[in-house]
From Swiss-Prot:
<dbReference type="GO" id="GO:0004177">
    <property type="term" value="F:aminopeptidase activity"/>
</dbReference>
<keyword id="KW-0720">Serine protease</keyword>
<feature type="compositionally biased region" description="Polar residues">
    <location>
        <begin position="33"/>
        <end position="50"/>
    </location>
</feature>
<keyword id="KW-0378">Hydrolase</keyword>
<dbReference type="Pfam" id="PF00326">
    <property type="entry name" value="Peptidase_S9"/>
</dbReference>
<feature type="glycosylation site" description="N-linked (GlcNAc...) asparagine">
    <location>
        <position position="814"/>
    </location>
</feature>
<feature type="active site" description="Charge relay system">
    <location>
        <position position="785"/>
    </location>
</feature>
<feature type="active site" description="Charge relay system">
    <location>
        <position position="863"/>
    </location>
</feature>
<keyword id="KW-0325">Glycoprotein</keyword>
<keyword id="KW-0645">Protease</keyword>
<keyword id="KW-1133">Transmembrane helix</keyword>
<dbReference type="GO" id="GO:0005802">
    <property type="term" value="C:trans-Golgi network"/>
</dbReference>
<feature type="topological domain" description="Lumenal">
    <location>
        <begin position="141"/>
        <end position="931"/>
    </location>
</feature>
<dbReference type="InterPro" id="IPR029058">
    <property type="entry name" value="AB_hydrolase_fold"/>
</dbReference>
<dbReference type="InterPro" id="IPR050278">
    <property type="entry name" value="Serine_Prot_S9B/DPPIV"/>
</dbReference>
<keyword id="KW-0735">Signal-anchor</keyword>
<feature type="region of interest" description="Disordered">
    <location>
        <begin position="1"/>
        <end position="58"/>
    </location>
</feature>
Length: 931
């Protein structure tokens, strides 16, 4: 691997052209002849793939009355378009980074779930250690490399007079950092020249006591368009905006109101179209309005969005897909078979949770000429039933049925359909997959070429298929057998379409993909044509492309921008590579200082890559700025008033001067078998050399996940360190991500085997090397979800030798109870891996829990992800053994995130104070009773 040393060339505009209106390229009517589809004969290509016509019909409508939600929530989506946004507390012109995030399966709920009204997004700071603070006593350690961070101090400052903080400070938002709203508005097509990119974005502003949406430009600071407020009246009823989408011409908006969360990414709500030329706001509705008890004829939709070129609005109602032209106001029904078992353009539970990570299953051609959508058939999938307990108006329990396939049981089946907007015909696409195939991704390479990925049921064999619409040709361009590297197929990152460039004699579309190379590391590969089977590897090395992967592309210089952990496995930086140069040699450029090894950056680029949102997330105070890409690469060196400072951290920096913040070190330990394990050590600011300290081990450990990085944090673990005077270790066992398949593949077919062994060995070695500072009678472990499972498996293995206390939140206790796609991806089916399921990966030695001084178990009753059945089975086994050395807290009607009815605050208070009592030995006199 070599990094090029040439400077990245960029254009500077002296004159900026007037922004032109984007006219639709669509000149044929939507669903011509006023019919849903036209009668055509099926077409067959040379491979025998058949495209069949479907004739949709009209639908009836029903709506559920729900309370209005007068605040905005943050929305995450796999869609390439970014103009749909949700915010916390729309009444303020900025939102707030928060204290807090908790891991769910694959780290996803902390990243993607809809936060509560005052939920703050993780905020945090652990600032570089000042060499002037000589009073700090560090734990001796032979473990290198190490990075230590702590508050910066002035020459006259010391830790005297500073105080510790507790979980209450975290929950009260004492460390919250306000952040201005900033979101790029995507153009209707990729901007190929930087001179045509004004850096159009929207923000919010308080005007006369009301929140207004404002469109602005990074190029022209004087450009400002008021798009209206976040409240409006319809038929005399006031509605408050929860989500907003803005088209590039700034003449149409889509609002979402009254949103009710369903699962991790999905919700239902009312959607509206606003015409900025007239000021009119009308509901987006199916053709037949409902008789809702709002008496307004409104319908709750799963979502509503602009198409990429802004010619259409598409939405899902009652699991059917609808389309309407932006200016027509009349929706057409595309599908007719939507039901509780059939999902059109919308994933079912398992596809939303484990595969697509989105509330949508539709992929638009970039010019709006066509769209492909998926239909999921859950008819044969078994239900789980979740009860609601807290409805005071119900004498009998209400329940919710969710289609939830478990290992070895029936999975949903999928079909793909092509909607041709130019002739109004809908075709079925013969994917060539098997009955139990899984659809992993879809993306248009060009306006006429659709690429998708499918695997076998066990996610071991991947087929990448490309379908060319004009020729009706379908080819499998890549086949990956993960059995060859003892791995599995994971959820994939989006590809980047590369357009033709005649001046370079590039006449065809191609694309950049991210997948493992021959050494097992995830890298960039260039496929020069849509049907190319042999790619050009662009990056190489014992590191991986991480985060969102490709974050931007500059057409003029053929430069690709991506994030990776090349400098350090726990950090992340921005890189670029020239597509032209890299066809002959592997040259990529680090765009940030390589000596800043522990920095963790994330970027979001504008369409032409001229402008960027730069987010430095650690290890120091988080900073978020926006401006020209070349001027926001290093936020520490920004002294330019023209750069937008989005984080407002003045009060935060002033407040933390009053606290002794913990010291964080990033370390590596080599185990007895030669495997290298990364971990984070968090210590109190002022260690007493005469005192022995408890240890809390924090673990997640899910296969392919990377939970512990150099992102800064002032959250639960830091509160434990500061308020309870505890040392925290955060350990990444083998099987986790970021280090290639040689490290990741240890988890295959034996979840819960290597994680507890690595955790136990790291903890023991740490204690041995620092024995003079460690109280070995007070060693605890905790985790949430997969982390709860790992904690319990560690206790089972350790049998009280090292760990004396454990806390498990929403844990899996038996993998036959979890969902099929996630579990079989790593474990195969139970009939194929009996030993793995029933001997290695289940918790079965319940007698080992007798050796604990105390166990704390927490779960929510409405957990649609890890069902409370897992916890009840565990507790039942403890009861059968007569064990009473455990505590349990059940949260009624809370899902996997445990947030319902003030639960999020209470769960962390419970964990914190339970741990306080444990380390104060208040449980030690409790006898373990036996039957």
């Amino acid at each position: 691997m070599s990094a090029s040393t040439h400077s990245h060339k960029r254009k500077n505009s002296h004159l900026f052209p007037q922004r032109k209106s984007s006219n639709s390229s669509m000149d044929k009517p939507f669903f011509p002849n006023n019919d849903s589809v036209a009668n055509t004969d099926p077409q067959s290509n040379e491979n025998g793939h058949t495209i069949n016509e479907i004739r949709p019909t009209e639908a009836t409508i029903d709506v559920t009355d729900v309370p209005q939600t007068p605040f905005l929530q943050e929305q995450y989506s796999m869609r390439p378009r970014r103009e749909s946004f949700q915010f916390n507390d729309i009444e303020n012109q900025h939102h707030t980074h928060s204290f807090f995030s908790v891991n769910k399966f694959n780290r996803r709920w902390g990243e993607w779930s809809l936060p509560e009204k005052r939920s703050y997004v993780l905020v945090f700071t652990l600032i570089a250690l000042s060499v002037l603070v000589l009073l700090v006593i560090l734990i001796p350690s032979k473990l290198l490399p190490t990075k230590i961070t702590r508050p910066k101090t002035s020459a006259g400052d010391s830790s005297l007079g500073k105080r510790s903080f507790s979980i209450e400070n975290v929950l009260n938002g004492d460390f919250a950092i306000p952040e201005d709203t900033f979101h790029f508005i995507d153009p209707p097509q990729r901007l190929l020249g930087q001179d045509s990119d004004p850096g159009l974005y929207f923000t919010t502003k308080e005007i006369d006591g009301h929140t207004n949406f404002i469109a602005k430009q990074l190029f022209d600071e004087t450009f400002e368009v008021n798009l209206g407020g976040n409240r409006f009246l319809y038929e005399g009823v006031e509605f408050t905006v929860s989500t907003v989408q803005i088209n590039y011409k700034l003449d149409k908006l889509i609002f979402g109101t009254n949103l009710e969360s369903e699962f991790r990414h999905s919700s239902k709500g009312f959607y509206w179209i606003k015409d900025l030329n007239t000021g009119n706001i009308e509901p987006i509705l199916p053709p037949e309005k409902s008789d809702d008890n709002y008496e307004l004829g409104l319908s709750k939709l799963s979502y509503a969005h602009f198409s990429p070129a802004y010619n259409y609005i598409y939405f899902v109602y009652e699991n059917n897909l609808f389309l309407q032209q932006v200016n027509s106001g009349v929706a057409k029904k595309v599908t007719e078979d939507g039901s509780k078992d059939i999902f059109n353009a919308k994933p079912d539970w398992i596809y939303e949770e484990e595969v697509l990570a989105s509330d949508q299953a539709i992929w638009w051609a970039p010019d709006d000429s066509k769209a492909v959508f998926a239909r999921f058939n859950d008819t044969s999938v078994d239900d789980i039933r979740l009860n609601r307990y807290t409805n005071m108006n119900e004498a009998y329990l209400s329940d919710t049925k969710i289609k939830y396939p478990k290992p070895g049981f029936q999975n949903p089946q999928f079909d793909l359909f092509l909607v041709n907007l130019q002739n109004g015909i809908i075709y079925s696409i013969n994917t060539g997959g098997q009955k139990d195939s899984i659809l992993y991704n879809g993306k248009w390479i060009s306006p006429d070429t659709f690429r998708f990925e499918i695997t076998d049921r066990n996610s071991k064999i991947l087929d990448v298929k490309v379908y060319d619409i004009p020729s009706s040709q379908m080819l499998t361009v890549r086949n990956t057998n993960s059995n060859l590297f003892n791995g599995w197929i994971e959820k994939t990152k989006d590809i980047l379409s590369i357009p033709p460039k005649p001046e370079l004699k590039r006449m065809d579309y191609g694309y950049i993909d991210i997948h493992a190379d021959s050494r097992g590391f995830s890298h960039l590969f260039y496929y020069p044509t849509v049907f190319a089977k042999e790619p050009i590897q662009l990056t190489k090395g014992n590191w991986e492309v991480t985060g969102n992967g490709i974050v931007g592309y500059e057409y003029e210089t053929d430069t690709i921008f991506f994030t990776a952990n090349e400098i350090g496995v726990m950090s992340q930086h921005l890189y670029s590579i020239s597509l032209t140069d890299s066809t002959t040699q592997n040259t990529f450029q680090s765009l940030q200082n390589p000596s800043d090894k522990y920095d963790f950056y994330d970027f979001e680029l504008s369409s032409s890559a001229r402008y960027a949102i730069s987010k430095k997330l650690g290890p120091d105070t988080p900073i978020k700025v926006a401006g020209p890409l070349t001027r926001v690469l290093n936020v520490a060196e920004i002294h330019d008033d023209s750069i937008l400072q989005l984080t407002k951290d003045e009060k935060f920096k002033e407040k933390i001067k009053n606290y002794d913040l913990p010291i964080t070190s990033y370390k590596t330990m080599v185990l007895d078998d030669g495997v290298e394990i990364n971990y984070i050590e968090i210590k109190p600011a002022n260690l007493n050399p005469k005192k022995k300290y408890p240890i809390l081990v924090n673990i997640y450990g899910g296969p392919g996940s990377q939970t512990f990085t150099t992102k800064s944090s002032l959250a639960f673990e830091q509160a434990v360190v500061s308020g309870l005077d505890v040392i925290v270790l955060q350990i990444e066992p083998r099987g986790t991500g970021g280090k290639g398949w040689s490290f990741r593949s240890w988890a295959r077919e034996k979840l819960g085997y290597w994680e507890p062994r690595d955790i136990t060995e790291v903890t023991k070695k740490f204690i041995q090397r620092n024995s003079q500072h460690i109280d070995e009678s007070k060693i605890a472990i905790w985790g949430w979800s997969y982390g709860g499972f790992t904690s319990l498996k560690t206790v089972e293995l350790d049998n009280g030798d090292t760990f004396k206390y454990a806390m498990a939140v929403a844990p899996v206790t038996n993998w036959t109870l979890y969902d099929s796609v996630y579990t079989e991806r790593y474990m195969n089916q139970p009939s194929e891996n009996h030993e793995g399921y029933f001997e290695v990966s289940t918790i079965q030695n319940f007698k080992s829990f007798e050796s604990l001084k105390r166990l704390f178990i927490v779960h929510g009753t409405f957990d649609d992800n890890v069902h409370i059945q897992n916890t009840f089975r565990l507790v039942d086994q403890l009861n059968l053994l007569g064990l009473t050395n455990y505590d349990m807290h059940i949260f009624p009607d809370s899902d996997h995130s445990i947030r319902y009815h003030n639960a999020q605050r209470i769960v962390f208070q419970k964990l914190y104070y339970w741990l306080r009592d444990a380390f104060a030995e208040r449980f030690d006199n409790t006898e373990v009773l036996h039957l």
